[in-house]
Amino acid sequence: MNFETVIGLEVHVELKTQSKIFSSSPTPFGAAANTQTSVIDLGYPGVLPVLNKEAVNFAMKAAMALNCEIATDTKFDRKNYFYPDNPKAYQISQFDKPIGENGWIEIEVEGKTKRIGITRLHLEEDAGKLTHTGDGYSLVDFNRQGTPLVEIVSEPDIRTPEEAYAYLEKLKSIIQYTGVSDCKMEEGSLRCDANISLRPIGREEFGTKTELKNLNSFAFVQKGLEFEEKRQEQVLLSGGLIEQETRRYDEASKKTILMRVKEGSDDYRYFPEPDLVELYIDDEWKERVRASIPELPDERRKRYIDDLGLPAYDAMVLTLTKEMSDFFEATITEGAEAKQASNWLMGEVSAYLNSAQKELEDTKLTPQGLAGMIKLIEKGTISSKIAKKVFKELIENGGDAETIVKEKGLVQISDEGALLKLVTEALDNNPQSIEDFRNGKDRAIGFLVGQIMKASKGQANPPMVNKILLEEIKKR
């Protein structure tokens, strides 16, 4: 029997507001434990929540960017459960009237475009953070308690772990472009749970789903889903039944491990939040928020292709992250040619960032520095080979490209007399290469050019070297 995989994703995104959703407590990441909390966050008796309007604006902005319909009437509800990181024993969330519904995004997998539906986007408060010491007790930090977040629930339209990965990449990109969140998984501002089930091909009814947690990266999401897909298939083929349960992905064993039997929504005993009135969002408010949405990745990608003449692949890679795209924009604003700027960002810059495991913001490279270097290449002041030395200096120490070239004596040698001397020495020292070239071995020219570049420490002008070299060989 062949099965079809059905995947749905629940993504939690912390909103980048200055204060929490129902209190004035600050939200910056990295503060000492339990220094960014208040009696409201901790649920002391007699305190009342006050809704943060900016959190509502940010949630609407995210929902609109994801093509959701924005509710006119929305409300908050209590989601009741006990856990040490939840001091009130309930979480203020949204149940039956979310702020956004019926959205979608488009992903590309293996050259094909697919639309993934978004069931809903709702506002809620985050919980605290538990740290398990391994000594029989756990520590709790309530700094995160009450931080505003949106939960984005996809339709069960995803059919492969690869599609799940592509969906998360696209969702993260869109949210980052709106500016409502930095989406840093390492800081917990983006978290994902995955639901997966299998059903016989052709059947409409869904199979029993399993929820996956402890997915600390998009790669873990994909790996966890791949393992769970195989596990469920083996269970079903052997005549077993899939239990509705929550499992976690363990990177060490590369398996999913049972955490608990999954609870249903009824177990949370949702009821309307009595301390908050229903929220009315009129058309004027919606339009103000809509007008604040910046250019999104798909729009920017189209502009790069249509207006800047970039290949579709370049445009796609450059717009994957807002940081890279903004850097590219600033670089061409400084006068760099678009394709050259794209080549450097996709090539040397990306290679350096991957190797050093850094973000662009963690380096000394500036758009002005990169643009200056590209212009020096275009003018013939430096060669592409020398440019790599300049680039290393720019990204590690910063500075001005022209100044670096002058101080380090990296100006390209374009003087014909100096180049003729280098060519003559190379020919005198390698007579066999001359014979090889005359006998049809074109690689001999490459060898001679290499000798000249080595002698000039990479500073000889390659096109001029080739020209003079061919002329001098003819004379011999």
Swiss-Prot record:
Heterotrimer of A, B and C subunits. The gene is gatB. InterPro entries: Asn/Gln-tRNA_amidoTrfase_suB/E, Asn/Gln-tRNA_Trfase_suB/E_cat, Asn/Gln_amidotransferase, Asn/Gln_tRNA_amidoTrase-B-like, GatB, GatB_C_1, GatB_Yqey_C_2, Gln-tRNA_amidoTrfase_suB_CS. Belongs to the GatB/GatE family. GatB subfamily. The keyword Nucleotide-binding applies. It comes from Bacillus pumilus (strain SAFR-032). One of its GO terms (biological process) is translation. It comes from the Bacteria. Allows the formation of correctly charged Asn-tRNA(Asn) or Gln-tRNA(Gln) through the transamidation of misacylated Asp-tRNA(Asn) or Glu-tRNA(Gln) in organisms which lack either or both of asparaginyl-tRNA or glutaminyl-tRNA synthetases. The reaction takes place in the presence of glutamine and ATP through an activated phospho-Asp-tRNA(Asn) or phospho-Glu-tRNA(Gln). Keywords: ATP-binding, Ligase, Nucleotide-binding, Protein biosynthesis. It catalyses: L-glutamyl-tRNA(Gln) + L-glutamine + ATP + H2O = L-glutaminyl-tRNA(Gln) + L-glutamate + ADP + phosphate + H(+); L-aspartyl-tRNA(Asn) + L-glutamine + ATP + H2O = L-asparaginyl-tRNA(Asn) + L-glutamate + ADP + phosphate + 2 H(+). The keyword Calcium does not apply. NCBIfam families: gatB, PRK05477.1-1, PRK05477.1-2, PRK05477.1-4. This is Aspartyl/glutamyl-tRNA(Asn/Gln) amidotransferase subunit B.
